[in-house]
Amino acid sequence: MSKRKQFLDSVHHEHVQDFLNFIKLHKDGADPFDLAEILAELQKSQRQDLWDRQLKLLQHSLTVSPSERWITGAEEDAGDMEVEVSEEQIQTMAVIEGVTIVSTVSVDALQEKDNYTTLLKCAQMLNAIESALPLSQTPLQQAIHWLFECWWRRDLQGKEELGWTAFLVCLENTVTLDKPVSELRRLCSLREVLLSVDFGSEKGQQVIDPLLQCFFRASHIKQEEGKRFLAFLFSWNDNFIRMIHETIKNQLQFFPKTLSVHVAEIYFRAWRKASGPFLEEIESACIQDLMQHALLLHRNSPVHSKVRQILTYFHKQKFREGVDEMLHRLYKPVLWKALKATNAEVRANATLLFTEAFPIHDPNMSSEMVDQAVQKQLDLLFALLDDPQPLVRSSAVLGVCSVLARCWEVIPSAVITDLLEKLILQLANDTSSPDVRCSVFMCMSIILDNSLSHPLMEKLLPALKSSLHDSSEKVRVAFVGMLLKIKAARAAKFWKVCSLEHLLARLEMDSAPVSKRIVNLLFNSFFPVNQPETVWCERCVTLIQTNPGAARKFYQHAYLYTAPANIVKLMLVIRKCLNVCIQNAGDEEFASSNKENSTLLEDVLSVQDTSSMASLLEILVILWKSVQKSLMANQEAFKYTTAKFGSSLPQYLKIFQEERCKAPLILLASLLPASALPALRSKVMSHLRSLKAGAAVTTYSQTLECLCSWGQISHIVELIENWLTEAAPVKEQGDEESTGKVHFDVLEESKPDLGLDYLDYMLLRPKTRECLLTLPLDQMRPLHKALNKWKSLLFSSLSGSEVSVAAIETALRAFIFHGRLCIHLQHKFPEEREFLKSLEHSVSWVEKRVLPFLVNSSSDQQLSLSTKIVESCVTVCKNVLRVSVGDSDFRDHLLQHVASVLQTEKGYMCIPHLLALLTEIAHGCLSQKAEGQEDQLSLTIRILTNIFQKVVEILAHRLRKDKEEGQELCCSSEEALHDFLLVTKFTSERSEFMTGVFSSLCAAVIIDISRPLQKISHVEELLMPETVNDLPPLSSTILKVTLGCPAVTRFFLSELSSSIESEAIDSITQWAAVTHILTIIKESDAFIVELKDIAGSVRRQIQNYYNSISENSDDIQRTIYESTVKMLNDVLISCQQTNN
């Protein structure tokens, strides 16, 4: 019996196993049995018999094991229960698989006159059960779906139902899978299925959301198959087009710019393929809507640039048939109107669209009408360049340049010349807007991309040369960018547009963004890497002699445009040049005899040319610093370079003795390791010792940095310590013996001021400070101790001893530096409180030794010195807290110190500094997490607010005692008081700190304003304040500070309201004072609610008060009452008007 006959017989429920064996053989690639060959050999009747038999087999299998009894994935995965799948279900799954395979092969083998009704029934049965298959049968589901897909492709009867199933599955997969490329291809091939489903039907509504989700997916939008599918969706239903468009608009802000171009392509494809009502809908609902958005959206909108990108894609398709006509028709009702809009941003947006789509015309019009339309549009370009708004003019400049670049060949030459002259001669010099000038230079690059423009541009561009010196940096950047474009496009000689002299002058003085571009422009001229290295050096010398400042700038940025190896080569060739100059200077007879063989450099340069020598040395340092990291990374190159310069540097130091040469030589030495210059260290230290007090920073800065880079900073510290110790006014017994060091330079003059200058320089610069603080404590403690000793001289001066002014100044500086050094050391070594205790001892010393002179000073000199000492101590302590070095104990110690200062007779003179210290204490308290320390922190805040109240009282007292001095004190305290009140933003409105601070301020202001009112003896003396300056000095100062910050003003008004509600204010003069405060605050046009509430409360209380004493009131009280009520009414009316 043949295989064909055996297979046909096996398709029966009684021979199921044989059937399954044949299916297994078909799936086995190594076996020759192939169902496709078997079906191809079957006669028509045999194929019909096969389909009938397999239908019955499938029906029998589903009767034996119906889908309702199948064990699904839920049961298979159920907890700890083991669910066994029956033999019947296993066999049924195998039969379904076999039937699916036979059906799929049969679809491919169908012939024209075949009756495939039973095959269709079989496929429909599979369609009915595919969704009920267990999760483990996913491959079987996929095989069934493939059968339906093949059915659709063959365009067989019943394809709609089967194709819909396949379409839904593919759609779901493309939305859910991370990499849906293959599914996208299948979905695209099945897209026509969608047209068989009505949009309004249940099936149609079922797929709307998944279809719209496709527009969220970047994979769909970018892939070719995805674009085809998404563009096809526009042809399903006109209502669906609007839904698609709204979905895309909502997603545009989240799309990257690169994706917007693909979205534009989808729109364009949809438009190209659409016709009839679909075309009308796409044009009106989508394209024209995008046009409207591009015109009306703000430029800072996240969507605007994406909408512009989509329309730009359409504009670039103008060469395609029908695009020009469509753009002309859709722009007509919106664009020309927008170009004349009153809103400048709309006009600017319209300008960009108009120039991008230029020329906008209908190809179906006659040539005469087209010419007329284009001429009108050219006239419009000129009008836009003259627009009164800079934003529109800038947009017009960009647009005109893009039009000229695209349409140079078709625009009349006279019009081109007029437009370019407008840009270059007028708008490039637009004094009203740097943005317009910047646009001209940036957009010239667009025109230069068209080579046809070069001859005319070469004639016109030199008129722009003065723009290199424009007052706006961004204009200068754009101008140099234009020169770079001219050079790259070879449109003209850039030095004919702007001379080399001007470029070098601007390079010398300009900022990095401009100078870097100038270096790029001139790089090949002064650093021609394709020529011999000697030429590099010659160009370097030429640049130095032309403009030394520009030369330094040029080589500062040269590393950006060449390899580090070339920079090192230039350094070495400059070294060689210097060596030759030195050699020639030492052997003049040899130099003169060898003149015929001398190079150009040897003829130009000589050691006596100090300026050129110094410039070459400076450039060496600049070049080395620019490639220092690269050199360090290549140790072989580093060792070679340091060896070369290490051998030459001692000779340079010997020959080049001029001051200008010494600085770069020291810097060059600092870049070399100390081992390369063993003899130089002593010379450097000798230089530091030889300087005189008051020497300029430039004379020692490089030397200090050089020693730091060598790791020799300990020698500087030792020198400073020796000078301070030897010049110290009081030497403890055994000090010199206890140092354990022998000093050979004790006969030298001590220079403590210069030592303090060195210390100041090292503490201020991060690099030197880091080096200083890396020293071990054993080397830092002697310096710390030496600084501390100078306190005794301050006390001696206060005690009446004769001390020179210079010595006092030195002692005061040493006292300050002692505090500064303590801060750095405590921050570096926070484990213990050694240096914090030292600061506490200094504070205690001030209290014990200095504060008595604030109580009773016999001379102005004593008072001035004691005040300076206290202020210096307070400033140091403030900085301790500012850098978070102090702890709670230190903070409490400082509060006690502030209280002690305020109790002295002249302590008020330190109030500005004390307020600054209180600010840092308050900030620390309010920002501290008081876990387990709530009581201590609360006590500290209470003491703080009491001290602040004392400060306010002292200010009021000084004003009463000496008005002029009090006013000066208020003015000097204003900034510190402002900073103190800003700390209140770190706390809640009704906190203990807030209440304490603002209750003191409110009371002070009310008392200060009401006191003059109580002294009025005549009605004419009553004056109403108009500004804060009309108030008494203390209240004026407090309100100025309060009104400087809305949050502080709100806290002040809150406390004022609480005082009124508590009825703590009970006199007509105090209510008048409150009204004066409200009158001043209302001028800010803010705090309407607070002002209205307070004014209402005051009016009620003052009315009740006056009703009770009106019979006994005198004329002055009545006048104060009437003026107060009038001001209150003005405040309330003002609040009402502001609300309206």
Curated annotation (Swiss-Prot):
The keyword Cell cycle applies. The keyword RNA-binding does not apply. Keywords: Cell cycle, Cell division, DNA condensation, Mitosis, Nucleus. It is found in: Nucleus. Its main location: nucleus. It holds the Pfam family Condensin2nSMC. HEAT repeats lie at residues 460-493. GO terms for cellular component: condensin complex; nucleus. Regulatory subunit of the condensin-2 complex, a complex which establishes mitotic chromosome architecture and is involved in physical rigidity of the chromatid axis. Plays a role in the embryonic development of the head and kidney structures. Component of the condensin-2 complex, which contains the smc2 and smc4 heterodimer, and three non SMC subunits that probably regulate the complex: ncaph2, ncapd3 and ncapg2. This is Condensin-2 complex subunit G2. It comes from Danio rerio. The lineage of its organism: Eukaryota, Metazoa, Chordata, Craniata, Vertebrata. The gene is ncapg2.
